[in-house]
């Protein structure tokens, strides 16, 4: 009679991914509701879907408004990264939109990577109004390190509800909203 046996089979697989840093605008202009529920939440949803579709890549997250900081360094632990997306909100740091500073911070996070491909994905409404580094300058720095920069414009042109804090709480008014496509294309 054959006796029952069990075996432990181990399989090592090697996958080769790329390194990606997502740079996300969290300025107050991202609270405009031309996208639902607002620009920031729409950008977070797009970013989370992107992360879920890239299981073999190292992905990091930089956030910026008037200043910039690293929310998550490059990691393959996408569960941690996705949880950190939930914590992102406008008002975490000084307001304004320093696109160049956010892009430069993303470059510093990925420039020393040994990956075969290095990519920065910039999610913003593109209206740069702060920072010591111009967006085009930061993009040129990325290019010198062999880093490709892809931009995702978040928003529409026209008018949209925008939240204002009043003595009676938050009220919404229609304001002119735009997306700076010229800067994003450069």
Question: Residue locations for each model-derived region?
Answer:
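VWA/integrin I-like adhesion module and closely mimicked acidic/polar interface patches used
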Residues: 94, 119, 126-185
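Membrane-embedded segments
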Residues: 3-117, 133
């Amino acid at each position: 009679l054959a006796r029952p046996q069990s075996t432990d089979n181990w399989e090592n697989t090697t996958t080769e991914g790329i390194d990606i840093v997502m740079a996300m605008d969290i300025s107050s202009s991202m609270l405009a509701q031309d996208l639902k529920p607002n620009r920031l939440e729409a950008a977070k949803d797009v970013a989370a879907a992107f992360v879920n579709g890239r299981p073999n890549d190292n992905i990091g997250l930089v956030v910026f408004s008037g200043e910039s900081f690293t929310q998550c360094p490059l990691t393959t632990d996408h569960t941690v990264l996705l949880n950190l997306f939930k914590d992102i909100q406008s008002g975490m740091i000084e307001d304004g939109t320093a696109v160049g500073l956010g892009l430069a911070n993303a470059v510093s996070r990925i420039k020393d990577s040994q990956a075969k491909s290095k990519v920065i994905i910039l999610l913003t409404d593109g209206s740069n109004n702060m920072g010591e580094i111009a967006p085009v300058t930061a993009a040129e720095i990325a290019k010198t390190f062999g880093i490709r920069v892809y931009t995702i414009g978040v928003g529409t042109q026209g008018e949209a509800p925008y939240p204002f804090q009043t003595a009676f709480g938050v009220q919404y008014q229609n304001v002119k909203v735009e997306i700076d496509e010229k800067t994003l294309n450069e």
